[in-house]
């Protein structure tokens, strides 16, 4: 009987992941691509329903991932070196969970094999977002959905 091999996210640190493993941790929820607002009084960060102009509002994937920095210079590029800063990511985020030493949820595509499950379980905001091109920045506060952290 062959020994059961633990999934890579359970046996490796973020720094040990290769590029494919790193990219596969993304569950495709698109929440990191939503615009966020910071409370000037206490520094709290709030997610809005307003998505980056490059985010596909249904699939929750970037429409130009390879060149996103060219079109959105302030696009956040997650790296293993930033793991201690991942608390702003949603508590369901694969990057954050692995950084915190936790397992991936049952709906994560690496666990269940279904990349659409993140949408079926309504973890993503698929179909519930607006593009930043549709809403004036002064109105983003009207579209708050949750507090980060």
From Swiss-Prot:
Pfam families: CxxCxxCC (PF03692). InterPro entries: Puta_zinc/iron-chelating_dom, UCP006173. Coiled coil: none annotated. It comes from the Bacteria. NCBIfam families: PRK05170.1-5, PRK05170.1-6, PRK05170.2-5. PANTHER family: UPF0260 PROTEIN YCGN. HAMAP family: UPF0260. Belongs to the UPF0260 family. This is UPF0260 protein PA1299. The lineage of its organism: Bacteria, Pseudomonadati, Pseudomonadota, Gammaproteobacteria, Pseudomonadales.
């Amino acid at each position: 009987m062959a020994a059961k091999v633990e999934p890579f996210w359970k046996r490796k640190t973020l720094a040990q992941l290769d590029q494919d493993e790193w990219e596969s941790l993304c569950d495709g929820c698109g929440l990191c691509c939503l615009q966020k607002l910071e409370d000037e009084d206490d520094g709290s960060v709030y997610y809005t329903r307003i998505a980056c102009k490059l985010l596909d509002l249904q699939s929750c994937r970037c429409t130009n991932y390879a060149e996103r920095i060219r079109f959105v210079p302030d696009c956040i590029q997650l790296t293993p070196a930033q793991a201690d800063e991942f608390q702003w990511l949603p508590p369901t985020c694969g990057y954050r969970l692995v950084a915190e030493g936790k397992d991936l949820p049952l709906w994560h595509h690496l666990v269940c094999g279904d990349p659409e499950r993140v949408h079926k379980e309504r973890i993503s905001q698929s179909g519930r977002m607006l593009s930043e091109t549709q809403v004036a920045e002064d109105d983003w506060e009207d579209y708050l959905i949750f507090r980060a952290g």
